């Protein structure tokens, strides 16, 4: 069924480039439709966020775009049940937009608009997408914050133990995947490794990772090693730049980390600041896992055609 849908999308989008594309309904989720145009726009959006996707064949990118827009639509349906309106404060939207265009090495919102225009995208379209993502994260916090287990004392002890002038930071990317049985981990990991060797870590993250970072090639940025738990730190410290970890088993997913770069900062550690960052990192990691659990739960209860 999925292959038939992708073939239909490919024919609808790429065999009609010289003409106006006819709008076709591809999915109907709880009376909310997804058309071939929606999927084409998602295609452009994902490539704008992660240029390396262009290295993949178009059918593969369409598959990623199809799954991505389905996730967005399902999230939007659930948000409409929990919020009066799907809207964010403009100041907060500006912060989120800056995070995006800064990662793309753009210096201003005007540069970002020009960049989006080159992909036939508008700023309002991006605002709508990041609003859904941000409100979804807020919903997950509302539902699961009481279930988070962050040992602040343990984290603080680890930071104090490493309170030295030279502080190490790592530039990391991630893939977080899931399996139904523990014995399937190695098989799935080997499948992902094969993909990484063929199409790169970024593109493999877009295909296999259920983390929100999959849209940006798994990029999680610079992380101080004191913000990481001992298990993750141990795995990273065994890597050379460019290498990635063996599967790291988390409570609700399997993590692969790639070491992009490492740097030493000749500064005294700000204990309170590092504690705050470490707590946020661990909290966000757990929330990301609960996000997947909740998404799977609501998806099962929706009427889904296509």
Positions of PLM-derived features:
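Short, low-structural-confidence N-terminal segments
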Residues: 1-67, 181, 303-306
């Amino acid at each position: 069924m999925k292959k038939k849908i992708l073939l239909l999308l490919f024919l609808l989008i790429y065999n009609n480039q010289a003409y106006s594309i006819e709008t076709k309904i591809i999915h109907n989720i709880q009376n909310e439709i997804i058309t071939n145009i929606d999927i084409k726009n998602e295609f452009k959006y994902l490539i704008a966020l992660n240029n390396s996707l262009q290295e993949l064949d178009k059918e593969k990118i369409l598959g990623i775009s199809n799954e991505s827009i389905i996730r967005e639509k399902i999230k939007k349906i659930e948000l409409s049940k929990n919020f009066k309106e799907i809207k964010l404060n403009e100041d907060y939207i500006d912060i989120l937009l800056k995070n995006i265009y800064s990662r793309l090495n753009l210096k201003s919102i005007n540069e970002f608009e020009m960049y989006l225009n080159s992909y036939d995208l508008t700023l309002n379209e991006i605002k709508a997408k990041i609003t859904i993502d941000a409100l979804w994260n807020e919903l997950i916090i509302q539902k699961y914050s009481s279930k988070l287990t962050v040992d602040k004392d343990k984290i603080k002890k680890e930071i104090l133990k490493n309170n030295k002038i030279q502080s190490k930071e790592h530039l990391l990317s991630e893939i977080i995947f899931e399996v139904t049985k523990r014995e399937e981990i190695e098989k799935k990991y080997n499948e992902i490794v094969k993909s990484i060797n063929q199409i790169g870590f970024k593109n493999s993250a877009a295909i296999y990772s259920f983390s929100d970072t999959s849209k940006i090639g798994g990029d999680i940025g610079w992380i101080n090693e004191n913000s990481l738990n001992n298990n993750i730190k141990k795995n990273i410290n065994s890597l050379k730049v460019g290498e990635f970890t063996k599967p790291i088993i988390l409570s609700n997913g399997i993590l692969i980390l790639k070491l992009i770069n490492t740097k030493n900062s000749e500064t005294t550690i700000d204990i309170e600041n590092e504690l705050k960052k470490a707590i946020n990192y661990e909290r966000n990691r757990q929330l990301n896992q609960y996000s997947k659990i909740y998404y799977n739960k609501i998806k099962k209860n929706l009427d889904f055609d296509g």
